[in-house]
From Swiss-Prot:
CDD domains: AGPR_1_C, AGPR_1_N. GO terms for molecular function: N-acetyl-gamma-glutamyl-phosphate reductase activity; NAD binding; NADP+ binding. It is found in: Cytoplasm. The keyword Oxidoreductase applies. The gene is argC. GO terms for cellular component: cytoplasm. Catalyzes the NADPH-dependent reduction of N-acetyl-5-glutamyl phosphate to yield N-acetyl-L-glutamate 5-semialdehyde. Pfam families: Semialdhyde_dh, Semialdhyde_dhC_1. Its EC number is 1.2.1.38. The keyword Membrane does not apply. One of its GO terms (biological process) is L-arginine biosynthetic process. Belongs to the NAGSA dehydrogenase family. Type 1 subfamily. This is N-acetyl-gamma-glutamyl-phosphate reductase. It is an enzyme of class 1 (oxidoreductase).
Length: 346
């Protein structure tokens, strides 16, 4: 067996954290040294999640303050915004970090403050590479610090980044209607996430006010080399555990056809292990749930010179834990598909 990378998963008992652990357990180059959480110290992960047994992982959950960082190569942070940056400030000089919070995604400190509040270490934000793997592969490979994108931004940016970079779509008037499984709201106990509140109901929330908006707009501006892109964004919770579908409404640049857009996406992602253009599979989350895949479909709009792009991902995998492992693989110069070759759930 080759050298195994020792990792710590901080925030291991949340939905994203436990998905990350599940993936890392199948990674031949990884040894999970520590699992950290605030409320389950001393317990096994199997006491929180029955689908993981003591035979799978016998590491007791510990407090972050009790771990020995000299025995860790990479720390995965599955923590809320604000909490994650506090940890990064302590460990930045010691280990590689893959952060799944929002704390290091937004590069403008004032924009971050407007949407999330004050940042405890804004001077460290520039050290982090935005971890949209298919777009920033080379930067990720060279970096020690990765800020993994949010789930909504992942589903939107995978199709739009190359189209804006290639000047195929207009940068203004972008409309996104996105639907997410309830796991996207996290594991904390809140009334609006109880079974009777979410079952058999579709609920819109934070219309034009979702915290993922500035993250999406930042990357769209980078893609288009502009400073003023604003999009209409409506997030919706749907009564399923996992899965995400974004319907994206776009106006084409003059002289550009639907075929041009589809061929551009096919060419851009021709070597991708996880992003595929397939109209039939892009119309259902069943094609992606349980995987790190993203399926895209390009459809004609009824309004002249418009198109509709459908983008589906698993919000817990390509939208979170799966992309984190993909980034880890790229960072460590491993095959990006290691531990991510799942087939979809039925």
């Amino acid at each position: 067996m080759s050298y195994q990378v020792s990792v710590a998963v901080v925030g291991a008992t949340g939905y994203v954290g436990v998905e990350l652990v599940r993936l890392l357990l199948s990674h031949p180059m990884v040894k999970i040294k520590y699992l950290c959480a605030t409320q389950s110290s001393g317990k096994l992960l199997s006491s929180n999640y029955f689908h993981i047994s003591q035979d799978d992982i016998s590491v007791n959950i510990s407090s972050f303050d009790d771990i020995d960082l000299s025995k860790v190569d990479v720390v995965f942070l599955c923590l809320p915004h604000g909490t994650s940056s506090e940890v990064v400030r302590k460990i930045h000089d010691v280990v590689r970090i893959i952060d799944l919070s929002a704390d290091f995604r937004i590069k403008d400190a004032e924009v971050y403050k407007q949407w999330y509040g004050s940042h405890c270490c804004p001077d460290l934000v520039r050290d982090f590479v935005y971890g949209l793997t298919e777009i920033y592969w080379e930067d990720i490979q060279r970096s020690r610090f990765i800020a993994c994108p949010g789930c909504y931004p992942t589903s939107v940016l995978i199709p739009l980044f190359p189209l804006l970079r290639l000047c195929l779509i207009k940068s203004q008037g972008i409309i996104v209607d996105a639907k997410s499984g309830v796991s996207g709201a996290g594991r904390s106990v809140k009334q609006d996430k109880l079974f009777c509140e979410v079952y058999d109901v579709i609920k819109s929330y934070k219309i034009s006010d979702h915290r993922h908006i500035p993250e999406i707009e930042q990357e769209l501006c980078f893609a288009a080399c502009r400073e003023d892109i604003n999009l209409q964004f409506v997030p919706n919770l749907i009564p399923v555990k996992r899965g995400m579908m974004s319907s994206i409404y776009l106006e084409l640049e003059e002289g550009v056809s639907l075929t041009d857009v589809r061929e551009a996406l096919l060419l851009f992602y021709k070597d991708s292990s996880f992003v595929f253009i397939d109209e039939e599979k892009a119309m259902t989350t069943r094609s992606v749930v349980g995987t790190n895949y993203c399926y895209l479909g390009v459809f004609p709009g009824r309004v002249p010179n418009t198109i509709i792009i459908m983008s589906v991902i698993d919000n817990l995998l390509k939208g979170a834990a799966g992309q984190a492992v993909q980034n880890f693989n790229v960072m460590m110069s491993y095959d990006e598909k290691i531990a991510l070759s799942n087939i979809p759930y039925f």
